[in-house]
């Protein structure tokens, strides 16, 4: 059964949990400097890597998908619109049947591993993605610096390279006028809050994403 069809903890408020880690192969140029040949090498390495560590992951090149299939991944929040719009020979995903594991290949970083669950499941998602990360590091040399941690294309992700987020539905807070107070509290705890369909706007929907901000100088466990 697909993860989004299952009931989750606290799912009257928390619609889903997502944890993502960004990783790059140590001996390959980062995305901004990589040639098409480099990115094809990354793609082939990712295909081999995720085939070896298994987890039922299927390798799919975006270019080989029809537009409806690609768009369905966007609607399930597995990838974003920009990723499928810019698809060429080098972009791909690795995904399992339950769709709770989805790896983006050659988006902003070489590989972006995502784990999903319905409801509030921070510990379970972390345990799964940590297990995946350990297996990746056993098989490949990943770009890492002893001082800074994992190296990523975007400086904001350097360190753990991990983003933890929950998708929440908050219609009551908005109607009672308390939403702004909650937004201020969330930001004090080092997290962002944004409308799922655009930056926070009172005219938008009542569905919000709350991700962490800090990745440098903090452990993965402390982020959770």
Label the predicted regions:
Residues 158:
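Active-site His/Glu-centered metal-binding helix of metallohydrolases
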Residues 164-172:
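Short glycine-/aliphatic-rich beta-strand segments at the starts of folded cytosolic domains
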């Amino acid at each position: 059964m697909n993860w989004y069809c299952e009931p989750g903890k606290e799912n009257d408020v928390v619609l889903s949990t997502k944890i993502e880690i960004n990783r790059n192969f140590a001996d390959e140029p980062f995305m901004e400097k990589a040639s098409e040949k480099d990115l094809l090498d990354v793609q082939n390495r990712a295909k081999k890597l995720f085939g070896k560590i298994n987890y039922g992951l299927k390798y799919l090149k975006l270019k080989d998908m029809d537009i409806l299939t690609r768009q369905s991944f966007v609607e399930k929040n597995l990838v974003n619109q920009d990723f499928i719009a810019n698809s060429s020979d080098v972009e791909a995903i690795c995904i399992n049947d339950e769709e709770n594991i989805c790896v983006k290949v050659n988006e902003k970083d070489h590989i972006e591993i995502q784990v999903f669950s319905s409801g509030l499941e921070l510990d379970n998602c972390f345990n799964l993605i940590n297990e995946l990360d350990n297996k990746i590091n056993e098989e490949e040399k990943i770009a890492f610096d002893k001082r800074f941690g994992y190296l990523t294309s975007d400086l904001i992700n350097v360190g753990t390279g991990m983003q933890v987020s929950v998708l929440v539905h908050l219609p009551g807070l908005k109607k009672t006028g308390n939403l702004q107070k909650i937004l201020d509290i969330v930001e004090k705890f080092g997290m962002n809050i944004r409308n799922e369909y655009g930056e926070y706007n009172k005219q938008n929907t009542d569905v919000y994403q709350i991700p962490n901000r800090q990745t440098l100088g903090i452990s993965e466990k402390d982020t959770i």
